[in-house]
């Protein structure tokens, strides 16, 4: 099952701030997830889909949905290696990832809309760093700091890899997260 998505909008104002992501760019979170998945596998971009397979009540596969390639990005391996290494270094600097049993690569981002609202928090990532199988993108509107988005992604990885139980992660109350635990954006 393919998901139709909105076309991304590239910034058309403020050339210098736009260069670092502070312009009028407009991307969906799922579009960013597809982007980071393309980065994780060094250039293969897939169509978005929400189903892996359809099974009956006994677990028999009725239909298997094979990912479809949308396009590829051809870069020299040295560039891909530099990108992967840089994204790994971003996460290595985050203290709240120190005890995670899986290596994650990611990129933080804090988008400033205006001075009357809190910044938007963003974190795109993939794991395991050595052989990617999952990407996670978190955007928190008016979330103040990308560290909050990165800590939320950490919890997704904990759940996905069975490192924490759902009850430990979903408590029904908001967590007090530590914006000083990372090194900032």
Set out the residue ranges of the language-model regions.
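Intrinsically disordered, low-complexity acidic/polar segments
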Residues: 133, 145-147, 163
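Short, surface-exposed, charged/polar-biased interaction segments
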Residues: 53-57, 104, 145, 157, ...
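Beta-lactam-recognizing serine transpeptidase/beta-lactamase-like catalytic domain environment
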Residues: 1-141, 181-185
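Short, charged, low-complexity patches
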Residues: 32, 145-154
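Short, gly/Ser/Thr-rich active-site loops of penicillin-recognizing serine hydrolases
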Residues: 61-68, 154-185
